[in-house]
Amino acid sequence: MGCCYSLSSTVDPVQDHTTDASSEPRNGGGEDPPLTKFSFSALKTATNHFSPENIVSDQTSDVVFKGRLQNGGFVAIKRFNNMAWSDPKLFLEEAQRVGKLRHKRLVNLIGYCCDGDKRFLVADFMANDTLAKRLFQRKYQTMDWSIRLRVAYFVAEALDYCNTAGFASYNNLSAYKVLFDEDGDACLSCFGLMKEINNDQITTGSVNPENVIYRFGTVLVNLLSGKQIPPSHAPEMIHRKNVFKLMDPYLKGKFSIDEANVVYKLASQCLKYEGQESPNTKEIVATLETLQTRTEAPSYEVVEMTNQEKDASSSSNLSPLGEACLRMDLASIHSILVLAGYDDDKDIIELSFEEWIQEVKELQDVRRNGDRAFVEQDFKTAIACYSQFVEERSLVYPSVYARRSLSYLFCDEPEKALLDGMHAQGVFPDWPTAFYLQSVALAKLDMNTDSADTLKEAALLEVKK
């Protein structure tokens, strides 16, 4: 049975639904933009029966597909899980609210589908991928510092507009919700504005405007570091590193330390590190606006990055390690890492004589005990030994992080495994093993699209070696 409620404005689904994503904010006058009521069959046709090949995001139980309408235009279609939005009237009312929003930094919501227990949203399609892909799965070109500053500013503008329009909360704000339009400019996905508030969320405070500020802080940490950091670990990244250690190694010598310090301080405030008071959206916009010194920063570089990656997307045969990671065969991965030993570390870490003197025998014994436990598949002991080694050394072999990462995977702790894969990448930025292990951890976390992208990047790095 179809939904019994309809919005006041509907448009024939075959008409052109492309809207100007660069339009200025709506003023008080004029008519509200219409929302199209799509049939389930129309969306099914647009996505080729919701083919996995058309999935562009599966970060949560809600999946986003790329669809093509009868007029040839592309759209993004979000499919909610069957447990969401049980009240169709509430769903339509909220879709109507979001559909009225128009801002040059916000992706337009253009339609919906409410068919039985099925719920869908339809938005303009952004052709140049997400910030997450630009930062975490980059292959050839590092995102310029000036572009990162513009991304932060544009997202802050979008959040401030939404807050002013009465949308104080945003569902799981992250680098995956920041999209790039055809001009290479950053826009915030409108899908995150659709939140079904239940009594449990109200009680726990999970729907809280301050959550948006915190999550924006994690995006700032992403932009500084170039790394995928779970939101719960973002304060730890700020706490353990100064701005020099946090910065993306690919940006070395290519950024302003004064500007980076401003972003670092703002991220600390958003994450409430050391009890700092969180800024509001207008204060965030004002701070980031002062950093927009390169208004001519070429957004087309983002478009060029996309084109380069499409040219390089033809995957070659995977190595034995790549095949094992694709199969998520932990036993085979273990055998390969044991056989490799520390060979890959030789070109990365060369201890000076003074460092060798400081490397006391007891600490080396701790690592050897960890290695012995790792070989014998006593992974809890390996984790304990490697953790002690990591805590007492300023410079850690990337293979230690790799071995602890795999140990965490065996112990069913994929989030910690992902962090260690990132730590290994931080020491050795172009090490395929670090990316391979991250791909397995991402798959364990049900982040399948990101896992596939990371696996592909590892394979490309392996070819370049």
Curated annotation (Swiss-Prot):
BSK12 exerts a paternal effect on embryonic patterning. Transcripts produced but not translated in the sperm cells are delivered to the seed where they become translated, resulting in a transient accumulation of the protein in both products of the double fertilization, the zygote and the central cell. Keywords: ATP-binding, Brassinosteroid signaling pathway, Cell membrane, Developmental protein, Kinase, Lipoprotein, Membrane, Myristate, Nucleotide-binding, Palmitate, Serine/threonine-protein kinase, Transferase. It comes from Arabidopsis thaliana (Mouse-ear cress). It is found in: Cell membrane. Residues 1-12 have a biased composition (Polar residues). Belongs to the protein kinase superfamily. Ser/Thr protein kinase family. It comes from the Eukaryota. Residues 1-34 are annotated as: Disordered. It is a lipid-anchor. A lipid is attached at C3, C4 (S-palmitoyl cysteine). Residues 50-291 form the Protein kinase domain. One of its GO terms (biological process) is zygote elongation. This is Probable inactive receptor-like kinase BSK12. A lipid is attached at G2 (N-myristoyl glycine). GO terms for molecular function: ATP binding; protein serine/threonine kinase activity. PANTHER family: SERINE/THREONINE-PROTEIN KINASE BSK5, SERINE_THREONINE-PROTEIN KINASE BSK-RELATED. ATP binds at V56, S57, D58, Q59, T60, S61, D62, V63, V64, K78. Interacts with YDA. Expressed at the mRNA level in the sperm cells in mature pollen, but the protein is only detectable in the zygote and the micropylar endosperm upon fertilization. Gene3D superfamilies: Phosphorylase Kinase, domain 1, Tetratricopeptide repeat domain, Transferase(Phosphotransferase) domain 1. SUPFAM superfamilies: Protein kinase-like (PK-like), TPR-like. Probable inactive protein kinase that activates the YODA MAP kinase cascade, which regulates the asymmetric first division and embryo polarity, by promoting the elongation of the zygote and the development of its basal daughter cell into the extra-embryonic suspensor. Acts as an adapter at the plasma membrane, possibly by recruiting and binding an activator. The protein kinase domain is predicted to be catalytically inactive. One of its GO terms (cellular component) is cytoplasmic side of plasma membrane. The gene is BSK12. Diacylation-mediated membrane association is essential for BSK12 function.
